[in-house]
Curated annotation (Swiss-Prot):
Keywords: Complement pathway, Disulfide bond, Glycoprotein, Immunity, Innate immunity, Membrane, Repeat, Secreted, Signal, Sushi, Transmembrane, Transmembrane helix. Residues 1-21, 401-490 are annotated as: Disordered. Residues 341-490 are cytoplasmic. Residues 1-41 form the signal peptide. One of its GO terms (cellular component) is parallel fiber to Purkinje cell synapse. Residues 430-456 have a biased composition (Polar residues). This is Sushi domain-containing protein 4. Acts as a complement inhibitor by disrupting the formation of the classical C3 convertase. Isoform 3 inhibits the classical complement pathway, while membrane-bound isoform 1 inhibits deposition of C3b via both the classical and alternative complement pathways. The keyword Zinc does not apply. The chain crosses the membrane at residues 320-340. InterPro entries: SUSD4, Sushi/SCR/CCP_sf, Sushi_SCR_CCP_dom. CDD domains: CCP (cd00033). It comes from Homo sapiens (Human). Glycans are attached at N104, N134, N192.
Length: 490
C-alpha cells in the first residue's frame, strides 16, 4: 500500500513548466543518443569537455521509511522523481518533483522541499498483565484493552479514562493494569514472593517469617484486597532476649520444644527426663523461656528409684512365658480329658452295666446266694411249671397267711421240720419263705408278702392274681428250691 499526496492548487507553476518541457523531451533524448555515438567514435576523453557542459539536477534523496522512483540515475532537465512511504507511514510533502531550469539558467528541483515519511498508525503499546484487542490504531482511534484476572486498569489522568492515538503515532494517557504493589520486607525476616514480581493480583496471600532470634510483630499473612491495597501493614521482626543454657541434670537430660533448639528464644519449652532407674523429685518437668529467663526457676534432680521396672525386653519375655504356660496348661487338660474318655470307653467294654431282663428266653441268668451261683430258669419255664410245682396247698397257704397245707394234700417236706402241726414250725417256715421272698424282691422287685395278711375270706381272684404276680415277676425262680437254701440250722 502506498500513500501519497496530490499536488495542491498552488502548484500551477509546476504544471506550466511541465507543459513547456514536454516538446523538448524528444530533443533532449536525441541529443543524449548523439552524444553517446560520438563518444563511441572518438573516445570518452575527447568528449569530456562536452559532458561537463551538460547540466543535471542533484539527487533528490530517498525519504526515511520510504522509497523513490527512479531509485537512481542522472536527472537531466525535465526529469521527474516520485516518492512513496512504507506501510504504517504517510508522506509529508510532494509526491513528485521536477528537474527544471531556473531564471538564472541553473537546473533545480521544483518544489524544492524534500518529502518525508511520518508514522501513520500508533504502534501497539506494551502493557503488562493486559490483552490488546485491536492490532492497528490510526489517528484519533481509542485504545481498547482488558486486564488479566486480579488486575485493574488505571489511567494517569483519573478524569480522562480514554487513551487516543495522536497524529504523530504516539498515545496520550496510556493506561496500565495494576494490582497490589510489592510490600516492604523486614530486614530480619523474609517473605515468600519473587524479587522480580512488582505487582500482585487481587486475592494473593503472602506470608512473612522471621530469622531465628527474632519475633514477628504483626500479622504473618497479608492479602491483596479489591481496592488494590494489602489487608494490613507489613509486620516487623523484633529481636528477642535469648535464655541461657538450661540447668544440667545429674543422671538425666532434657529436650526442647519446638525442635531443633539452635537458640533458646522467648517461648521455648524445655522438658527434663531421667535415666533408667532414676526418677524426678518433682512431678513438674517443664520450664519456659520468658524474656531471657527460665520460668519457673528451680533446680531439677533425678534420684535413684526404689523399684526398678523391667526393661522392655524383660517385659516381652515375661509376656511370652505367661502365654506359653497358659497354652501348655490348656493342652494338658485337653489331653487328660481325652485319656479319661478312652479309659471310660474301655472299662464299659469289659464290664457292661446291668440292665433290664433280656427279651430272649434262651439267655441264661444266675444269682449268687452265700457265695454259690444258682442258675435261674427261663421265663417260659417259670410260667409253665411254677404253679404246678407249688401245688394247690401252697396257693391256699398264700391266701391264708402261710398256714400248713391241708391234710389231703402232700406238701413237700422241709428239712429240719419233723411234724405237721400248726405250731411254731409254721411261723418259722413262713419266716423262711418271707426271707427268701425279700431276697428275690431285692433282685427282681417281686411283690412283698404283705399279701398274706389278707384274710381268707377275700375274693379268690385276688389270691390267684397275687400268685400270678409272684410267678410272673420272678421268672426262672423255683420257690421250692430257694427256701431250703435260705433256712438256718436250728
Amino acid at each position: 500500500m502506498y500513500h501519497g499526496m496530490n499536488p495542491s492548487n498552488g502548484d500551477g507553476f509546476l504544471e506550466q513548466q511541465q507543459q513547456q518541457q514536454q516538446p523538448q523531451s524528444p530533443q533532449r533524448l536525441l541529443a543524449v543518443i548523439l552524444w553517446f555515438q560520438l563518444a563511441l567514435c572518438f573516445g570518452p576523453a575527447q568528449l569530456t569537455g562536452g559532458f561537463d557542459d551538460l547540466q543535471v539536477c542533484a539527487d533528490p534523496g530517498i525519504p526515511e521509511n520510504g522509497f523513490r522512483t527512479p531509485s537512481g540515475g542522472v536527472f537531466f532537465e525535465g526529469s521527474v522523481a516520485r516518492f512513496h512511504c512504507q506501510d504504517g507511514f504517510k508522506l509529508k510533502g510532494a509526491t513528485k518533483r521536477l528537474c527544471l531550469k531556473h531564471f538564472n539558467g541553473t537546473l533545480g528541483w521544483i518544489p524544492s522541499d524534500n518529502s518525508i515519511c511520518v508514522q501513520e498508525d500508533c504502534r501497539i503499546p506494551q502493557i503488562e498483565d493486559a490483552e490488546i484487542h485491536n492490532k492497528t490504531y490510526r489517528h484519533g482511534e481509542k485504545l481498547i484493552i482488558t486486564c488479566h484476572e486480579g488486575f485493574k486498569i488505571r489511567y494517569p489522568d483519573l478524569h480522562n479514562m480514554v487513551s487516543l492515538c495522536r497524529d504523530d503515532g504516539t498515545w496520550n494517557n496510556l493506561p496500565i493494569c495494576q494490582g497490589c504493589l510489592r510490600p516492604l520486607a523486614s530486614s530480619n525476616g523474609y517473605v515468600n514472593i519473587s524479587e522480580l514480581q512488582t505487582s500482585f493480583p487481587v486475592g494473593t496471600v503472602i506470608s512473612y517469617r522471621c530469622f531465628p532470634g527474632f519475633k514477628l510483630d504483626g500479622s504473618a499473612y497479608l492479602e491483596c484486597l479489591q481496592n488494590l491495597i494489602w489487608s494490613s501493614s507489613p509486620p516487623r521482626c523484633l529481636a528477642l532476649e535469648v535464655c541461657p543454657l538450661p540447668p544440667m541434670v545429674s543422671h538425666g537430660d532434657f529436650v526442647c520444644h519446638p525442635r531443633p533448639c539452635e537458640r533458646y528464644n522467648h517461648g521455648t519449652v524445655v522438658e527434663f527426663y531421667c535415666d533408667p532407674g532414676y526418677s524426678l523429685t518433682s512431678d513438674y518437668k517443664y520450664i519456659t523461656c520468658q524474656y531471657g529467663e527460665w520460668f519457673p526457676s528451680y533446680q531439677v534432680y533425678c534420684i535413684k528409684s526404689e523399684q526398678t521396672w523391667p526393661s522392655t525386653h524383660e517385659t516381652l519375655l515375661t509376656t511370652w512365658k505367661i502365654v506359653a504356660f497358659t497354652a501348655t496348661s490348656v493342652l494338658l487338660v485337653l489331653l487328660l480329658v481325652i485319656l479319661a474318655r478312652m479309659f471310660q470307653t474301655k472299662f464299659k467294654a469289659h464290664f457292661p452295666p446291668r440292665g433290664p431282663p433280656r427279651s430272649s428266653s434262651s439267655d441264661p441268668d444266675f444269682v449268687v446266694v452265700d457265695g454259690v451261683p444258682v442258675m435261674l430258669p427261663s421265663y417260659d419255664e417259670a410260667v409253665s411249671g411254677g404253679l404246678s410245682a407249688l401245688g394247690p396247698g401252697y396257693m391256699a397257704s398264700v391266701g391264708q397267711g402261710c398256714p400248713l397245707p391241708v391234710d389231703d394234700q402232700s406238701p413237700p417236706a422241709y428239712p429240719g421240720s419233723g411234724d405237721t402241726d400248726t405250731g411254731p414250725g409254721e411261723s418259722e417256715t413262713c419266716d423262711s419263705v418271707s426271707g427268701s421272698s425279700e431276697l428275690l424282691q431285692s433282685l427282681y422287685s417281686p411283690p412283698r408278702c404283705q399279701e398274706s395278711t389278707h384274710p381268707a375270706s377275700d375274693n379268690p381272684d385276688i389270691i390267684a392274681s397275687t400268685a400270678e404276680e409272684v410267678a410272673s415277676t420272678s421268672p426262672g425262680i423255683d420257690i421250692a428250691d430257694e427256701i431250703p437254701l435260705m433256712e438256718e440250722d436250728p
